[in-house]
Swiss-Prot record:
Zinc finger (C2H2-type): 137-159, 573-595, 601-623, 630-653
Domain of life: Eukaryota
Protein name: PR domain zinc finger protein 13
Organism: Homo sapiens (Human)
Disease implication from the record: Cerebellar dysfunction, impaired intellectual development, and hypogonadotropic hypogonadism: An autosomal recessive disorder characterized by delayed motor development, ataxia with cerebellar hypoplasia, severe progressive scoliosis, moderate to severe intellectual disability, and delayed puberty with congenital hypogonadotropic hypogonadism.
Lineage: Eukaryota, Metazoa, Chordata, Craniata, Vertebrata
Length: 707
């Protein structure tokens, strides 16, 4: 459910069959789907909708615009009936039926994958299992547990303090404005931001660089009212009047809306920056990979940026656009001085130049060619030291987030002129593929470096599309993928603060240090689990991303996964303790009891506890009265199965055999009836890792017991 909090919650259910593919919308107002989602479903009034002449209406005949905001967020994919979609990035948001909705079924919605990436909502959720084998979803930042995956995703996006999703240091706009903790942007002459939703109306990239002397920029992106916009009372994004742009307060509102549309408002997403005081442009890079994992510590960049006073990484302060962040980090560092002042004449001139080239408008997520990065607020020291922030949307086993990245030498900044020429490999910065096209002179602009760093003379345009960083010339409208892999090269910072501003004052240095140490312990624990899983050949659910040797081993030795081939992707339920993979959830549930020691079953005769029902069934046979067919002829020990008896004779009575004891000749069978389904008569396909002292390692499952 999104919008204002409602008590009691109203749900929307179908009064008739709703066909798959039906579209509802557009969704009005501020889009905050999942902000009030929780594991519990509070009972409340229900609104029924039905099809009338091909359109869904409620009991009173109201259109979807009147009740679409009452549709609650889905907690998992099983109960989800609708998905939120947008035809274009920044376009209006609609709801689409995923399947045929039966009468009486509640309408629930969640983000589509593309829209989730746009809003920086995690798209994957890996469950863990508690001592009872129930699925739980853990936030690796604050250790809160959830029963449903979407509850965790919503928590990370809107509420988790440590991940930057909400509360505490990273306040939402409305919270920061109420507390008066938002300082005005230094040098811009703007008042503090008024209360505003999380996602504001989109605006052009030109508004990211306000200049007091420049004319009002022209909107070239079209009307986009559906996604990341202000409330319905906000002015139109297609025709901003000069009077609105002329006033400082209105200009601040428009600037905030533009920044909210840009990647800076996507502060909960991945942001990888390698900043250094280099004189070359490629010595420092930054980009948004797109999808982030909800289960690895990924808030370091945001926290580090907040700790160092980075304005565009704090939602509670004046923010800068994602294109600006990319441009500034590509430029090799920060330029000191106030914008538009004598301290940084280059910045002011470039801003003036930009406003006279309003036809070069791009999506706010794109970096315009020739746009200079903005300077930091006065007093912010220029950092010449290298800082690497480990935020990569790659599997944890493949890329470690705790290694150090060495800055590329200035020679790596030389851009080859060939269209598909490869950049020379730089130490510490391996480039898998980088083909730079010949940039049109119209898309280039020379920009003199500041006092602390130097921007390159050639700055291509960058954008993010489908989760991949693209670059190219805006004049040719041709973009090419740029893939950077920093796996195994990033080092975890020694000390880092999760908070800044008023929140930091409430915490002592010891508490801040303990937060970082907790994050390090989590990372080391996850790394150990990953190494164990990879060593067993079962640590990756997708064997296609494994090395050939490990993938081949995983295809033949996966526990409980059946006859999976080495070339087939392995899917199933993974044990986080030992890395075993099970095709059935029940198998993992029983297996987890061997690690946790949870034994809910008991023998009715001797009250011995068991965790595996198959072990209990085999144990009960030991209490059978009368003659048992599986008794050792050498020592009289009673066993449960034929294979247990054979194993017992081989280990306890070496040199003896069942055939010799039978005395019927070498070709005769002993007088033991075959076990049904022998030799594969296991009552369970669960691999048991016994950790208690009551287990007999000889039989591996309690098949041999002394009475």
């Amino acid at each position: 459910m999104h919008g204002a909090a409602r008590a009691p919650a109203t749900s929307v259910s179908a009064d008739c069959c709703i066909p798959a593919g039906l579209r509802l919308g557009p969704v009005p107002g501020t889009f905050k789907l999942g902000k009030y989602l929780s594991d519990r479903r509070e009972p409340g009034p229900k609104k029924k909708v039905r099809m009338v002449r091909g359109e869904l209406v409620d009991e009173s005949g109201g259109s979807p615009l009147e009740w679409i905001g009452l549709i609650r967020a889905a907690r998992n994919s099983q109960e989800q009936t609708l998905e939120a979609i947008a035809d274009l990035p920044g376009g209006q948001i609609f709801y689409r039926a995923l399947r045929d909705v039966q009468p009486g079924e509640e309408l629930t919605v969640w983000y589509s994958n593309s829209l989730a990436q746009w809003f920086d909502i995690p798209t994957t959720a890996t469950p863990t299992h508690d001592e009872k084998g129930e699925e739980r979803y853990i936030c690796w930042y604050c250790w809160r547990t959830f029963r449903y995956p979407n509850s965790l995703k919503a928590h990370l996006r809107f509420h988790c303090v440590f991940s930057g999703g909400g509360g505490g240091a990273f306040l939402h706009h409305e919270h920061a404005a109420r507390q008066g903790a938002v300082p005005a942007a230094d040098g811009l002459g703007l008042s503090p931001k008024p209360p505003a939703p999380d996602f504001a109306a989109p605006s052009q990239a030109g508004t990211l660089r306000p200049h007091p002397l420049g004319p009002p920029p022209v909107q070239a992106c079209g009307a986009r009212e559906g996604i990341k916009r202000e409330a319905s009372s906000a002015p139109s994004a297609t025709s901003p009047t000069p009077g609105k742009w002329g006033q400082p307060k209105k200009g601040k509102e428009q600037l905030d809306r533009a920044l909210d549309m840009s990647g800076a408002a996507r502060g909960q997403g991945h942001f990888l920056g390698i900043v250094g005081g280099s004189s070359a442009g490629v010595g420092s890079l930054a980009f948004y990979p797109g999808v982030r994992s909800a289960f690895k510590p990924a808030g370091l960049a945001r926290a580090a940026a907040a700790a160092h006073g980075d304005p565009y990484r704090e939602e509670s302060s004046s923010k800068q656009g994602a294109g600006l962040a990319l441009g500034r980090l590509l430029g090799g560092g920060r330029a000191c001085g106030r914008p538009g002042s004598g301290e940084n004449s280059a910045a002011g001139g470039a801003g003036h130049h930009h406003h006279h080239h309003a036809h070069h408008h791009h999506h706010p997520k794109c970096l315009l060619a020739g746009d200079p990065p903005p300077p930091p607020p006065p007093g912010l020291p220029c950092s010449g030291a290298l800082r690497g922030f480990p935020l990569l949307s790659v599997p944890p086993e493949e890329a470690s987030a705790f290694k150090h990245v060495e800055r590329a030498p200035p020679a790596a900044a030389a851009l080859p002129g060939a269209r598909y020429a490869q950049l020379p490999p730089a130490p510490g910065l391996p480039l898998e593929r980088c083909a730079l096209p010949p940039l049109d002179p119209g898309g280039l602009k020379a920009y003199p470096g500041g006092e602390c760093s130097h921007l390159p003379a050639v700055m291509p345009a960058f954008t993010v599309y489908n989760g991949e960083l693209l670059y190219g010339s805006p004049a040719t409208t041709a973009y090419y993928p740029l893939k950077l892999h920093f796996g195994g090269l990033l080092k975890y910072p020694e000390s880092i603060s999760y908070f800044s501003g008023p929140a930091a004052a409430a915490l002592s240095p010891a508490e801040l240090g303990s937060l970082a140490s907790i994050d390090r312990e989590i990372a080391m624990h996850n790394q150990q689990l990953s190494e164990m899983a990879a060593g067993k050949g079962r640590g990756r659910l997708d064997s296609g991303t494994l090395p050939p040797a490990v993938a081949a081993a995983g295809g033949t030795g996966g526990g409980g996964s059946g006859g999976s081939g080495a070339g087939k992707p392995k899917t199933g339920h993974l044990c986080l303790y030992c890395g075993k993979l099970y095709s059935r959830k029940y198998g993992l549930k029983i297996h987890m009891r061997t690690h946790t020691g949870y034994k809910p079953l008991k023998c009715k005769v001797c009250l011995r506890p068991f965790g595996d029902p198959s072990n209990l069934n085999k144990h009960i046979r030991l209490h059978a009265e009368g003659n048992t067919p599986y008794r050792c002829e050498f020592c009289g020990k009673v066993l449960v199965r034929r294979r247990d008896l054979e194993r017992h004779v081989k280990s306890r009575h070496p040199g003896q055999s069942l055939l010799a004891k039978a005395g019927d000749g070498p070709g005769a069978e002993p007088g033991y009836p075959p076990e049904p389904g022998d030799p594969k008569s296991d009552d369970s396909d669960v691999d048991v890792c016994f950790t208690d002292d009551q287990s007999d390692p000889e039989v591996g499952g309690g098949g041999e017991r002394d009475l």
